[in-house]
Amino acid sequence: MHAADLEKPMVEKQDQSPSLRTGEEKRDVSISRLREAFSLRHTTENKPHSPKTPEPRRSPLGQKRGMSSSSTSDAISDRGVLRPQKEAVSSSQGPSDPTDRAEVEKDSGHGSTSVDSEGFSIPDTGSHCSSECVASTPGDRGSQEHVDSQEKAPETDDSFSDVDCHSNQEDTGCKFQVLPQPTNLTSPNTKVF
């Protein structure tokens, strides 16, 4: 469908009743948002590293349909399409939410913390937690070699009974748990997510 084909039925329907007019306005705004998102997506696919948004492309889009570009473009830029890009920029600079900031500050630096598009912190700890959770201070790193030797050649199922990952879990911000004895799930140290 062409933009000119959409305008003619909308003008006729707007004269019928005010309730249809608000519905049609909502429909028109949603169509313009879809077109805007589509044009932005193609622009970002062609130039993925471009930090600027294509401002000049939006103005002709509203003018081609015969609508005032200021009302349509302003409504889109204020509410919908540009918001995810602004959030992505702010999340790359650091967390703006106080809870995210506290979570990153709680990290001791053994694992890198990244923030995804929704703002959740994801610790990059590798395939297992023992090296990040157990060695939280330089003094604990000497005992880390002992833990690694037990991991490589465990003699019995109780080889991890003397290792307590829970004591350093809050200090490092590590999200993983190592339970020494999986049969005892009702201990007070066990956290349920």
Curated annotation (Swiss-Prot):
Superkingdom: Eukaryota
Skewed-composition ranges (Polar residues): 180-193
Signal peptide extent: none
Biased composition (Basic and acidic residues): 1-15, 22-58, 76-86, 98-109, 142-155, 163-173
Region (Disordered): 1-193
Family: Belongs to the DNA mismatch repair MutL/HexB family.
Protein name: Protein PMS2CL
Source organism per UniProt: Homo sapiens (Human)
Gene: PMS2CL
